[in-house]
Every structure is written in C-alpha cells, then in structure tokens.
Regions:
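Paired small-residue
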Residues: 104-112, 300-308
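Structural signature of the two symmetry-related core transmembrane helices
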Residues: 81-95, 276-290, 372
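Intracellular juxtamembrane helix-capping segments at the cytosolic ends
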Residues: 119-132, 314-328
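Helix-breaking motifs and short loop linkers at transmembrane-helix boundaries and internal kinks
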Residues: 78, 99-101, 273, 295-297
Length: 392
C-alpha cells in the first residue's frame, strides 16, 4: 500500500502538492528564523532601525530583480530542478553571515539568498495553483498557507529556543533549506507546466498585472506587512522592553495566527467571494497596529493581538494567489505569479524602509503608524475600484 502511494500514477497529483507544500513550509521556517536573527544582530552592530530596515530591503530588491526572469528560467529548466538548485544555493549562503559580520556584506548576501528564495516560491506556488481543482483552489491555497504559516511559527519558536547569537540559529537555517530538497527528490508526480515563449516575456507579466490588479495589490500590502513584521517588530519589541524570549514568542504568536486563519479564510473565499474576504482582511490590517499600540508591553495582550493581526494579514497572500488561479491557467500562471511575487517584493522593499524611518522619527510607534497607513491605502484602492465598476 505504501509503495503504491509512492509510485502509483493515481496519487501523483497529491504527491506533487505535498512536496511543493512541504518544501515551501521548510523554506518559510528558515526565513522566519533567520530574518529576526539578522535584524537583532544588525541592531546590536549599529543601533539603527534605518540600517536594519535598509538591510532587510536587500531581500526585496532581489525579489524585484529575479521575479521577471523566473518564467524564462522555467521555460528552459524543469521546475523540480530549479527548486532544488535554488534551495541549495540559499543554504550555502547562510554560514557566510556569521563569518562576515559587516552590514554591507550582509546586504549582498541577503540579496543573493533572496533571489534563490524567490525562485522557490514562484515555482512552488505556481505548481500548487496549476494542480489545485478550480472549485477548491482557495481552500487548497489556504492549506498551503497554513503549512507555510506553520513553518513561520516553528521558526519563531526556534528563535526563542536558540536565541539570536552564536552559530546555532545559522546551522539550523542551513539544515532547513537543505532539507527542503528531500520532498522534491522523493515524491514524484506531475511537474510544473512550463510557459511558452510568449507567456514568459516581460510584456506578458505587465499584462498579467493589469488583468488582476486586486491580486497585485494584495501581494504588495502583504509584502510590506510581512517583511516589516519579521524585520522590525523584533526591534519594536526590544525598544518597548521585551526580553529575547518574549520577542520570540511574539513572533511565534503572529505566525501561529496564520495557521489558525488560512484554511477558514480559504473556505470563506470559495463560498462567499474572494474580493469580499480581501476587503475584510485589509480592514483588519488597518486596525491591527492600533491594537498593538494599546497592548503596550503586556505580553499576553500583545501575543493575542499579533495572533489575529498577522493571521488575517497572511490571508492576503492566499487570496491574491486564489485570484490569480481564477483568472489564469496553464503556463500563463507562471507569469502571473511572477508579477504577484514581484509586487510582494516591492512591498517588502518599501515597507521596512519606510517603517524604519517612521520608527526613527516617532520611536518606536512610527512603525505602527506606517503599517496602518499602508493598509488604509489598499482599502481605499479596493473601494475606488468597486465604485468604478458600479453601473451609473
């Protein structure tokens, strides 16, 4: 029976889904562990939130730089091969961080690591979107986001256990990225449907963004919210007086919120409508920073708010992917997903940089003001689009 599951053609689609989901969740776990470790080490090196924010922007710049080329890479290279190569490349950069403790060098290393991670996520998410049945797409993407958030939560817990100093967190991160190759190698099934030359072009990506602007906006806001959370909220926690272990639990609470919310949000999106749930999630993103401010340094209140805030905000990623899966098919999904990830990269670039400046001007609450303002901007965009579509 077990051999039949591993080898039987009837289970190939499920094996591919499982391998893509496990791979991405391990990658997410490594990301969530190392982002706060990098931020806390940079804070110790420089004492500047601006340096932390700008350095965190390296990963976003790499996403913007490589995302337009991923469809072309997937046109020439089988998806499984590209994912394995990217995971190993990311793993090999990790030991260089503690060996070369310099903010400028870390910027370069994070750029290289970010390119590899971007290729993994564009490939794996396209793979899931192509395989998922249309009627259950948001639910399956919710399950994927749940597994990804589980990886994020595990990364936060690992930070609480391992701390941010010494070699332990770096070695753990290396093992996580390298381990992501195992399900790709062991679980065989349908691969990624490769795009044709026209679908892989830059112009096709621009057209895809124009065809699904709500999805692109969701990626933009999620990129800003998520990366700011992992890059600067550890610094926020430090500046309001939380010890390292409480910061780790705060990060874990936010990531675990993603586990609790993604599948319900996916089911609601399949039943009620993706745009309605997107509006709800965006409103929660606008309100969340105010509740974080009101929580102060009370750990219990802060953990509870982070659980809901980050959990619902993560839903923007699920919803954006579901909208892409609804509007595109086959190889064209690669290009649309690349546009979505590129928008995520732009958000990841702008969010920490702007929030870092805000944090320096209004220490430390400028971070919360910027986070809320970005969500309100996207909520206004959704409202204007709805008014434009309403018949006169």
């Amino acid at each position: 029976m077990i051999a039949g599951w591993f080898l039987g053609a009837e289970h190939g689609r499920l094996r591919s889904l499982i391998s893509a989901i496990i791979c991405a969740s391990l990658c997410g776990c490594g990301f969530t562990l190392l982002m706060p470790v990098m931020s806390l080490n940079l804070e110790a090196m420089t004492g500047s939130a601006i340096v932390v924010g700008v350095n965190s922007a390296a990963a976003a710049l790499s996403t913007i730089a490589i995302a337009p080329f991923v469809p072309r890479l997937l046109r020439r290279i089988p998806g499984r091969t590209l994912i394995i190569f990217s995971l190993l490349s990311a793993a090999l950069t990790i030991p260089l961080f503690p060996l070369l403790p310099d903010p400028t060098i870390w910027f370069i290393l994070r750029f290289a690591m970010g390119m590899a991670i971007t290729a993994v996520f564009v490939s794996s998410e396209t793979w899931i979107n192509q395989i998922a049945p249309a009627g259950k797409r948001a639910t399956i993407l919710g399950l994927y986001a749940t597994a990804l958030a589980g990886g994020f939560g595990a990364g936060g817990l690992m930070l609480a256990v391992l701390g941010s100093t010494g070699w332990a967190p770096w070695i753990a991160g290396l093992c996580l990225f390298a381990g992501g190759t195992l399900p790709i190698l062991l679980l065989r099934g349908p691969g990624i449907e490769q795009p044709d030359s026209e679908s892989a072009s830059f112009s096709a990506m621009i057209k895809a963004a124009g065809y699904a602007p709500a999805a692109i906006g969701a990626g933009l806001l999620f990129g800003a919210t998520e990366t700011t959370f992992f890059a600067l909220f550890p610094v926020y926690g430090d500046r309001i007086g939380l010890p390292d272990h409480s910061i780790g639990y705060m990060m874990a609470a936010g990531a675990l919120g993603g586990i609790a919310f993604q599948t319900p949000l996916g089911r609601l999106a399949d039943k009620i409508g993706r745009m309605q749930i997107t509006v709800f999630a965006t409103a929660a993103c606008a309100l969340g920073p105010l509740l974080i401010y009101l929580s102060g340094a009370n750990p219990v209140a802060l953990y509870a708010v982070m659980f809901v805030y980050v959990g619902v905000a993560t839903g923007l990623y699920t919803l954006g992917l579901a909208i892409i899966g609804e509007r595109f098919e086959g190889g064209s999904m690669v290009t649309a997903n690349a546009a979505f990830i590129m928008a995520y990269g732009v958000g990841s670039l702008a969010g920490p940089a702007i929030s870092g400046v805000g944090m320096e001007i209004i220490n430390p609450y400028g971070l919360l003001i910027v986070s809320s303002a970005l969500a309100l901007g996207y909520l206004l965009f959704l409202g204007l689009r709805k008014l434009q579509r309403r018949p006169a």
